Amino acid sequence: MVPPGNILFLLLLPVATAQMTPGSCSGCGPLSLPLLAGLVAADAVVSLLIVVVVFVCARLRSRPTQEDDKIYINMPGRG
């Protein structure tokens, strides 16, 4: 559940953005198209890298051990 303070912040955020004038950002430079494309491409590469690492780690954990073919009488679920 979201705390009440965060809900109030989210509700007042559009009001605050409507009060700002365009170009009122001090110290903000415009992003060139190659820089923006590079940021998007880098984000996609890092996201794919995270997906691959998670997939490999999950696959390594789900490999059966060598003792899975043994039958244990006193262990339910193994025989």
From Swiss-Prot:
Similarity comment text for this entry: Belongs to the DAP10 family.
Q: Assembly and partners?
A: Homodimer; Disulfide-linked. Heterohexamer composed of four subunits of HCST/DAP10 and two subunits of KLRK1. Interacts (via transmembrane domain) with KLRK1 (via transmembrane domain); the interaction is required for KLRK1 NK cell surface and induces NK cell-mediated cytotoxicity. Interacts with PIK3R1 and GRB2. Interacts with CLEC5A. Forms an CLEC5A/TYROBP/HCST trimolecular complex depending almost solely on TYROBP. Interacts with KLRK1. Interacts with CD300H.
Extracellular topology: which positions?
Answer: 19-35
| Keyword Oxidoreductase assigned | no
Name of the protein in question: Hematopoietic cell signal transducer
MF terms from GO for this chain are: phosphatidylinositol 3-kinase binding; signaling receptor binding
Q: Where in the cell is it found?
A: Membrane
Please give an example of a GO cellular component term from this record: cell surface
Q: How does it sit in the membrane?
A: Single-pass type I membrane protein
Q: For the region PIK3R1 binding site, what residue ranges are annotated?
A: 72-75
What start-end ranges are recorded for coiled-coil regions in this protein? none
Where would you find the membrane-spanning parts of this chain? 36-56
| Residues in the signal sequence | 1-18
Tell me the domain of life: Eukaryota
Functional summary from the UniProt entry: Transmembrane adapter protein which associates with KLRK1 to form an activation receptor KLRK1-HCST in lymphoid and myeloid cells; this receptor plays a major role in triggering cytotoxicity against target cells expressing cell surface ligands such as MHC class I chain-related MICA and MICB, and UL16-binding proteins (ULBPs); these ligands are up-regulated by stress conditions and pathological state such as viral infection and tumor transformation. Functions as a docking site for PI3-kinase PIK3R1 and GRB2.
Q: Which residues carry this modification: Phosphotyrosine?
A: 72
State the UniProt keywords alphabetically: Disulfide bond, Glycoprotein, Membrane, Phosphoprotein, Signal, Transmembrane, Transmembrane helix
Q: Which residues lie on this side of the membrane: Cytoplasmic?
A: 57-79
